[in-house]
Amino acid sequence: MPAEGGKTDMERIGLFSEMEYITVGDKYVSQFNRPFNESASKNRQILPGGSKEMSNLQAGYFDPHFVRIFEGESYVNPNQVRRRYMMEEAKKNLSKAFLPSNGEKKPCGLGSYYGTIGGPVPFFSAQSKPKEKYEPPGKNLYTNPGKKGTGYGYANITIGKQFSHSSDLYDAAKLNNKKENEEHRRLLKGTAFKLNLYTREYFDTNPYMSEKPLPPIKKVEKKETVGNPFKPSSPGKKAGGMKAGTFDPYPSHSADPYVVKLKSPSSKSAKVFHPPGGPKSRPIESIMALNVKRALNMKNYKTASVQSY
């Protein structure tokens, strides 16, 4: 038996271990690029075993190929079953068309007079009947002749008389404006009234306003000040070492602990927790190696020409 938390020899060899579990849609990763113990660094740690999906590989079974469970059970082909059903349904179809026993019966529904007492009415017959030639009636008497148009472009058709033509002067508007200006100037009495006295202002003058020019502005002389030389700040204090330049004095040494640590009672009888193991690896042979093993044997290894991929 292995030590506590270890693996058995069968689990280390991996030939008779439990079948591998895979998920749908995972891409194939070669064993050279696959990291060692990937489950210890990715995803959540120390999880109990959940639902697993069995793989479709044949490595976990005793037989190399799948064997039928029941003896004498045959393979069912869905295409063959569907074709047999179609053939059985085709046998139900009749070769000849269906013929009635008593022949065709005359219709006696809407529009038919078969079986009635009086028979067909000649008035409702669909045949064409001779008709007399149509003569349209004459027009009524007119009391007044029709109007000629709407009046525009037609002479002497309106209620009143036509307007007589009267020619206008070429400068009629200019002459009328001139007459109005002359009449306006005739009504004027003289020129505009002008007062010969000194004009006085409506408000008093501003007492705070002076017409004298202001004196020039005196410029204040600035004294040149010589600044102190630049002095960089002192570097940051480091932990440890001499503390003479700090604000507070260095604390004195104290041998007493700040908090007394309590001893936790340990129960040696309790079992040690071991996390569940990760996925187990199996030795899988490459497809290229299988191709080489099948193509080369002890009989044709001298004359064989294997295609390289």
Swiss-Prot record:
Compartment annotation: Cytoplasm, Cytoskeleton, Microtubule organizing center, Centrosome
Assigned protein family: Belongs to the CFAP96 family.
Coiled-coil ranges from the UniProt annotation: none
Alphabetically ordered keywords of this record: Cytoplasm, Cytoskeleton
Official protein name in the record: Cilia-and flagella-associated protein 96
InterPro entries, per database record: CFAP96 (IPR029358)
PANTHER family attached to this UniProt entry: UPF0602 PROTEIN C4ORF47
Cellular compartments per GO CC: centrosome; cytoplasmic microtubule
Superkingdom of the source species: Eukaryota
Species in which this protein is naturally found: Bos taurus
Renumbered residue ranges of the record's region Disordered: 225-251
